[in-house]
UniProtKB/Swiss-Prot annotation:
Family, per entry: Belongs to the class-II aminoacyl-tRNA synthetase family. Type-1 seryl-tRNA synthetase subfamily.
Name this protein carries in UniProt: Serine--tRNA ligase
Subcellular location: Cytoplasm
Species whose genome carries this gene: Halothermothrix orenii (strain H 168 / OCM 544 / DSM 9562)
Catalytic class of the enzyme: ligase
Gene name of this polypeptide: serS
Coiled-coil residue windows: none
GO CC list: cytoplasm
């Protein structure tokens, strides 16, 4: 959430930001509501001052034995007017809050201006895509032939975009989760195992609500939402709290199942496990001093990259342009892994700096020193990594001519095998 004072004083700047993002927000309504709110507050303050002054006068008249009935009647009218204004003010402030919550974050100056993913800027590459000397297969064909992915039964039991992982496929998924968490905890992240359902306040805190309610699964008749990412519960771990400056930075890593409606993905990635309603992910979340957040973003991205390097999977890093930037982010790097069946790089991690956008929504602050005014922390998060897409990338990049899949060396202690065979 942007600071209301900042929006008021920089309406043109915010309007320009929305244009660069290729989106809209009701700034005219914000201006109208904000002006009306300030007028009412000023009027109420004047009425309260008048009531206080006249209340003293009523006391003087009563002590003098004089009639104060007219002034008392006038004060009742003033009190009724104040009550009416207070009710109007509550309605205005509620709507104003909704308007402010609908305005996205300001992109950092280093974010390239562009319309969509075609305007994202490549930063670096690691590894060379494998050149196959046989006709390679997509992961969905490999998985069915090896009997480690069962799409038909996933669809029967749940519906489209659900999959059973079986045998070595399930073990590969579990091994990746353990490997990733082990690596990140060695890098100073504290492991968290979060709830997979959260309330609406948590979703507002990280920016999923109110704008993206259609992308989430809500438990009917409750205030519970299935989490789209562990970012939501882990960021809200410190909601409405004040951290000590000496405790910053705070690093957390969390495994969770993730649940997404994929409302805008009709017809995209209908085969395989690239785009599922339920998938597993290891998430990295940071709470840092505002002066350090962009430095911490570089470290976070490198931490996610290390996983792909250890798995020896080719990838590239791109900076998202303004038109492709997520709602809450000030700057995002996407890490994209090479997928032979798609003949391109596909996103496997997004690493973002939200600055104080989420912290302001969630009320997460820190005290620079004892007795000092509390300030908002900066929050960051990134996938470290998406498990299903990592499984798919391993299957496609490590496949053999006989249909088997070589297990990456770093995973063999977790898997207890070198090759997944038919």
């Amino acid at each position: 959430m942007l600071d209301m004072k900042f929006i008021r004083e920089n309406l043109e700047t915010v309007a320009d930001m929305l244009k660069r993002r290729g989106t809209e927000a009701p700034l005219d309504e914000f201006k109208e509501l904000d002006e009306k709110r300030r007028e009412i507050i000023q009027e109420v303050e004047q009425l309260k001052h008048k009531r206080n002054v006249v209340s003293s006068k009523i006391g003087e008249l009563k002590r003098a034995g004089e009639d104060a009935s007219d002034i008392i009647a006038e004060m009742k009218e003033v009190s009724a007017t104040i009550k009416k204004y207070d009710e109007e003010l509550r309605g205005i402030e509620e709507r104003l809050q909704q308007v402010v919550l609908s305005i996205p974050n300001m992109p950092h100056d280093s974010v390239p201006v562009g319309e969509d993913e075609d305007d994202n800027v490549e930063v670096r590459r690691w590894g060379e895509p494998r050149k196959f000397d046989f006709e390679f297969k997509p992961h969905w064909d490999l998985g069915e032939a090896l009997d480690i992915l069962d799409f038909e039964r996933g669809s029967k039991v749940s519906g489209a975009r659900f999959t059973f992982l079986k045998g070595a496929g399930a073990r590969l998924e579990r091994s990746l989760i353990s490997f990733m968490i082990d690596h990140h905890t060695q890098n100073g992240y504290t492991e968290i195992f979060p709830p997979f359902m959260v309330n609406s306040d948590s979703c507002i805190g990280t920016g999923q609500l109110p704008k993206f309610a259609g992308d989430m699964f809500k438990v009917e008749g409750t205030d519970y939402y299935l989490i789209p990412t562990a970012e939501v519960p882990v960021t809200n771990l410190y909601r409405d709290e004040i951290l000590n400056a000496e405790d910053l930075p705070v690093y957390h890593v969390a495994y969770s199942a993730c649940f997404r409606a994929e409302a805008g993905a009709h017809g995209r990635d209908t085969r395989g496990i690239i785009r599922q309603h339920q998938f597993n992910k290891v998430e990295l979340v940071k709470f840092v001093h505002p002066d350090k957040s962009f430095e911490e973003l570089e470290k976070l991205t490198r931490n996610a990259e290390e996983i792909l390097q250890m798995l020896e999977l080719p990838y590239r890093v791109v900076t998202l342009c303004t038109g492709d930037l997520t709602f809450s982010s000030a700057k995002t790097y996407d890490i994209e892994v090479w997928m032979p069946a798609y003949d391109t790089y596909r996103e496997i991690s997004s690493c973002s700096n939200f600055k104080d956008f989420q912290a302001r929504r969630a009320g997460i602050r820190f005290r620079p020193e004892p007795g000092a005014k509390a300030e908002y922390v900066h929050t960051l998060n990134g996938s470290g990594l998406a498990i299903g897409r990592t499984v798919a990338a391993i299957m496609e990049n490590y496949q053999n001519e006989d249909g088997s899949i070589t297990v990456p060396e770093v995973l063999r202690p977790y898997m207890g095998m070198d090759v997944i065979k038919p």
